[in-house]
Amino acid sequence: MIIQTAKKIINDVEDNLGGNMEKITTVLFDLDGTLIPFDQKEFIESYLYHISNKFVPMGYDKNTLIKALWDGTGNMVKNDGKVRNRDVFKSTFAELMEKEYDEMEGDFMEFYEKEFDDVKQTLQEEVDRAGFIKTIKDQGLKVVLATNPIFPKAAIQTRLKWIGLSVDDFDYVTTFENSHYCKPNLEYYKEIFENINSKPEESIMVGNNALEDMIVSELGVRTFLITDNLENPEKIDINKFENGNFDDIANKVLNIL
């Protein structure tokens, strides 16, 4: 239904640009809870269960492993940009595990390419986002996967596969290998725009977190908040953002391109 709507909208693009509105050149999407329909808490619980099942039989302590993952993630979120997120994670992980991350990285990549796929069971429904993303790209726009870069590329690729997509379907994907900041730091978004040579005022951001995703509006980005799996622990008034379920927001986005 979205694609049929898009075909009609594409024929009227010029009429939908609006008076003083900047022409949109770039669309950014969050991943978890936005393109992928799942509850973040259920995802994390399943992720920790499966990664523990991978590494505990190899002789690693479960509690230490989970603490290393949590603390490593927390330190990436606080990254000040001096090094890439991967380096922050490596340092924290090595300190707690008393073993260099590089020595375990092969096992981590194997996990993200294989066992991690079982976390797909947390999806609330089977969806295929390929047609939707293609419709946007066919308009000549840049499409960015602006997922919080606390995971390696391999983990993002596996999650994208669940919804019929690949990292190759995007012009840019934020990963812990290529990013120096995390959400909700505005520097995270500034780094994206610098790397893809786009302007915030010519961009749209679609996400489900009222703080982490919507904060980019402070740079002049037009934002859309997905409410299907809304994340809003800060109790931000979401009425100040354009919001709705995924299908509603998808059609709104297509309507202004």
At which residue positions do the language-model features occur?
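Short histidine/acidic/glycine/proline-rich micro-motifs that form metal-
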Residues: 35-37, 75-76, 147-151, 178-179
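Short acidic alpha-helix initiation/capping motifs at coil-to-helix transition points
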Residues: 41-48, 81-92, 150-151
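Active-site neighborhood of HAD-like aspartate-dependent phosphohydrolases
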Residues: 12, 16-68
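Short, flexible loop segments at the rims of nucleotide/cofactor-binding pockets, characterized by
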Residues: 119-123, 152, 180
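Short, acidic loop-to-helix structural element flanking the phosphoryl-transfer center
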Residues: 105-106, 114-144
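A metal-dependent, Asp-based hydrolase signature
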Residues: 70-113
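Asp-based, Mg2+/Mn2+-dependent phosphohydrolase catalytic module
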Residues: 2-27, 134, 148-150, 156-257
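Residues at alpha-helix caps and immediate loop-helix transition turns in enzyme cores, especially N-
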Residues: 40-43, 47, 125, 155-156, ...
